[in-house]
Regions:
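Domain-level signature for soluble enzymes in the chorismate/prephenate branch of the shikimate pathway
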Residues: 1-106
Length: 106
């Protein structure tokens, strides 16, 4: 027989999952910032639409294969937002590096 959880138990479970999601999102964005640093050093643009399309295709395929309560389209929308925030963090880090380069050069 399946375990019946109370609302509070389910909310506690959700809180734990939320904390894990925040931790993983921060790790993901930290990786993106490092990729941005490497792209900056190589003189490459931060925004690379082909890579974004690749990530969203992979995410859509994963969401379809896992077939959870979220549709593949919903998962893609979530990841579009995650990617936007990662790109913003990359730009901010790049601007800080540029300011540091200017200050060091003076």
């Amino acid at each position: 027989m399946a375990e019946v959880l109370t609302i509070e138990e389910l909310r506690t479970r959700i809180d734990v999952i939320d904390e894990q999601l925040v931790r993983l999102l921060n790790v993901r964005v930290a990786c993106a910032v490092e990729v941005g640093r490497l792209k900056h050093e190589a003189g490459m643009p931060i925004y690379q639409p082909e890579r974004e399309a690749q990530v969203l295709k992979r995410v859509r395929e994963s969401a379809t294969a896992l077939a959870g309560p979220l549709t593949a389209e919903a998962v893609v929308r979530i990841f579009e937002r995650v990617i936007d925030e990662a790109r913003r963090a990359e730009r901010e880090a790049s601007q800080r590096r540029d300011r540091l380069d200017i200050n060091i050069g003076e």
